[in-house]
Each structure stands twice: as C-alpha cells, then as structure tokens.
Regions:
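Conserved metal-binding segment of the jelly-roll/cupin
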Residues: 87-107, 222-243
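Extended, compositionally biased flexible segments
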Residues: 32, 39-105
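Generic N-terminal segment detector
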Residues: 1-53, 269-279, 284-293
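Short, surface-exposed beta-edge/turn micro-motifs
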Residues: 57-60, 91-92, 110, 192-194, ...
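Double-stranded beta-helix
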Residues: 110-150, 209-211, 249-293
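Glycine- and acidic-residue-biased ligand/ion/polar-headgroup-sensing regions
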Residues: 56-78, 169-170, 181-228, 233, ...
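Short, structured patches in soluble enzyme cores that scaffold and shape functional sites
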Residues: 98, 106-108, 114-119, 149-152, ...
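A short glycine-rich, His/Asp/Glu-containing loop-to-beta-strand
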Residues: 19-52, 59, 143-194
Length: 293
C-alpha cells in the first residue's frame, strides 16, 4: 500500500536497467526530496567503464555495494571491493571532503551508492575498509537485526552518517518505532534519512510503516529490491517478508552528527524485551563469503 500523496512523494522505485547494462539505478536530489540535506544515487558500471565527478561544495561518501573498482581522488588511488553483493560481506567505502575530484573505474561489474550533503569543511579523504566498520547486534527474538556502521558520529566528517542494516527473514528492524525529527539533544536530533533496499531474492519484499507523532499520517509501503525511501519525520519501522533477508543502506544528515532518536512511547518497553537473539544473526561477516567477487 502506497496510495497516499505522502507515500508517493517519499517512495522512489529503481530504474529499469538490465542486469548487464550500466546506468543510474536510483537517484534523488535535494530539490526532488524537498529537503536541504542529502543527494543520493546508486550507479552500476560494467568492467572497463569509469565514472568521473567532483564533490564541489559537498562532502561525499561512496559505498561499494558489490564488485571491485579502483578509485582516484586526485592525490590518492586505491583498489577497493571484495564482496559480490551486499549479502556477501562488509563494505568498502570512500569518504571525500568538498572540492575533491573523483574517478571510479570498474574492474568487475560493480554497483555503488553515492551520498552527498552540503559542506565547507576541508577534511581528509579516507578509505573505509571492512575491518574499519563496526558491527552491532540489536534486539532479540524476531526483532534481532545486524547493524554495520560505516561512518559513525566520531568519524572525521562534517555531516554524513552511514550504516548498513541486515534484517533476517520474518524479523523486524528500526524497532521499537523511533523518530528523529526534533533537535532536542542528547535525547533526539533532527535527521533526514534514506533507506535504500536490497532483497536477498528478486521476488522478495519488505513493509515499512510511516506514521507521525500526532496520528495525522499513517502509511504502509511495500518495498522491493532497489527501492529508496526518504524519511523526513515520524516513525518508520520495517519488517522483512518470510523467506527473504532484507538489507538497507541508511544515510543520515541533519542538525547534529548524532544518532539520537526517541522511541514511540507506546512501544518503548519492547526495547529491552529480554528475548534471546536470533541465531541467524549476524547475516554477514567482515570477511567476504563464497558469494563474494
């Protein structure tokens, strides 16, 4: 269900790009999103192709979703990539400050997310390798999920925050429902957020409920592989359909470099349920599995 005007505004479906073709898989600008924070896109390159850009007046993070590539940022050059896809291991990522040139050359077919926010800070480009990412297992029972932090609040960036979340088949995540739409530190900060979805099988799906604190808006989105959801305010829990593991890439930016959020008070007691962790978690490890490139 995604019939309301609000649901149509915040749900962006993937472009129809053939698996053996390069192109932009999904994209949203700040103007399109009607916020002043995040530009987000996902691209695919075929082996031998390259893509050039410049961060200009933004800081950027490129998260390699799968495949191998070389990245050149003017004064640095690295080969990155190990996992075949997001379900095969932790990511490589590249952080680039404002006014930095960028070239990505595909060694294999590769897909990468490009997240950018306005910035004037002259910081240092950095390669983030799988061992640099921090894992956290949250929840218990059928609310167990795995978080892989890529750019944490303590990372030397100006605004960007990025993590990957893995939700096993049938489980809930972003739960208890929480929001981050008020600047009231340290309890909560005002953050815009993207959810970029990948599903373990092409026919799989997930649901995400979007509702506000006042009870004036309540939408449920049906999400398939490649969908992008924009979280501007309100609560936004997720559940994975039985039989399909769900991945989403979160990019956040806003009033502070903090992940502080407030739970829906009706469900806050579920945060410390005391249930044992789902033994299927973690779904991925830092070292790439046999599915990796």
């Amino acid at each position: 269900m995604a019939g309301s005007s609000y649901a149509q505004e915040v749900l962006i479906h993937a472009a129809k790009v053939a698996p053996d073709k390069s192109g932009v898989l999904v994209s949203v600008t700040r103007t399109q999103a009607r916020w002043d924070t995040i530009n987000f896109s996902v691209r695919r390159l075929i082996a031998g192709q390259y893509w050039q850009s410049d961060t200009r007046d933004e800081e950027a993070a490129v998260v390699l979703l799968g495949g191998r590539a070389t990245v050149n940022w003017g004064h640095g050059y690295r080969e990155i990539g190990a996992r075949r896809d997001v379900f095969s291991g932790y990511p490589y990522a590249v952080y680039l400050p404002c006014h930095t040139p960028l070239e990505i050359s595909a060694l294999t077919t590769c897909e990468f997310a490009d997240a950018r926010v306005p910035s004037s800070a002259r910081l240092t480009p950095r390669i983030i390798e799988p061992p640099d990412c921090r894992e956290e297992i949250r929840g218990g029972g059928n609310c167990t999920r795995q978080i892989v932090d890529v750019i944490r609040p303590e990372f030397p960036a100006e605004k960007l925050l990025i993590c990957e979340v893995y939700t096993p088949s049938g489980n809930w995540s972003s739960y208890p429902p929480h929001k981050h739409d008020v600047h009231n530190p340290p309890k909560e900060v005002d953050l815009d957020e993207t959810y970029y979805y990948r599903i373990s099988q092409p026919e799989g799906y997930a649901f995400q409920r979007l509702y506000d604190h006042a009870g004036t808006r309540d939408d449920t989105l049906t999400l398939v592989d490649g969908d992008l959801v924009l979280i501007k305010d309100g609560y936004h829990p997720v559940v994975a359909a039985h039989g399909y593991n769900v991945y989403y890439l979160n990019v956040l930016a806003g009033s502070a470099r903090s992940m502080a959020a407030s739970d829906d008070p009706r469900y806050a007691h579920l945060r410390n349920s005391g249930l044992e962790r789902d033994p299927r978690v973690p779904l991925v490890r830092a070292e790439p599995t046999e599915r990796s490139a």
